[in-house]
């Protein structure tokens, strides 16, 4: 773990969806679970539409089940709400739980349905056996 600016740079690169920068920082030893100044990890602030960023972070040890300290949302909640099936699948295959509620009692499937993301809702129902 390098700490400091490398870890902060990783969160920024993940948020911007900068795949090559994320790869370089991780290969240089940046901590995929380092908290930013808001108490969030790179996998929580990553550009949800970038399944490649998710894969890189997870490959280097990012925790797929980390919860937001205020809302209890996890990356799967964000991917389901925003409509990013590819990212959701990557997270799920890496061990992300689909059966955990956020602070308002909503599951990822609830968020997908609220937003009209039928393909994601179908995937989540199939994955959870509902």
UniProtKB/Swiss-Prot annotation:
Top-level taxon of the source organism: Eukaryota
Keywords associated with the record: ANK repeat, Cell cycle, Phosphoprotein, Repeat, Tumor suppressor
ANK repeat spans: 5-34, 38-66, 71-100, 104-130
GO biological process: cellular response to cell-matrix adhesion; cellular response to nutrient; cellular senescence; megakaryocyte differentiation; negative regulation of epithelial cell proliferation; negative regulation of G1/S transition of mitotic cell cycle; positive regulation of transforming growth factor beta receptor signaling pathway; regulation of G0 to G1 transition
InterPro entries documented for this protein: Ank_Repeat/CDKN_Inhibitor, Ankyrin_rpt, Ankyrin_rpt-contain_sf
Molecular-function GO term, any one: protein kinase binding
PROSITE patterns (alphabetical): ANK_REP_REGION, ANK_REPEAT
Gene3D superfamilies according to UniProt: Ankyrin repeat-containing domain (1.25.40.20)
Induction pattern: By TGF-beta.
Translocase as UniProt keyword: no
Tissue: Expressed ubiquitously.
UniProt xrefs under Pfam families: Ank_2
Similarity comment: family membership: Belongs to the CDKN2 cyclin-dependent kinase inhibitor family.
Assembly mode: Heterodimer of CDKN2B with CDK4 or CDK6.
Function according to Swiss-Prot or TrEMBL: Interacts strongly with CDK4 and CDK6. Potent inhibitor. Potential effector of TGF-beta induced cell cycle arrest.
The protein's name in its UniProt record: Cyclin-dependent kinase 4 inhibitor B
Native source organism of the sequence: Mus musculus
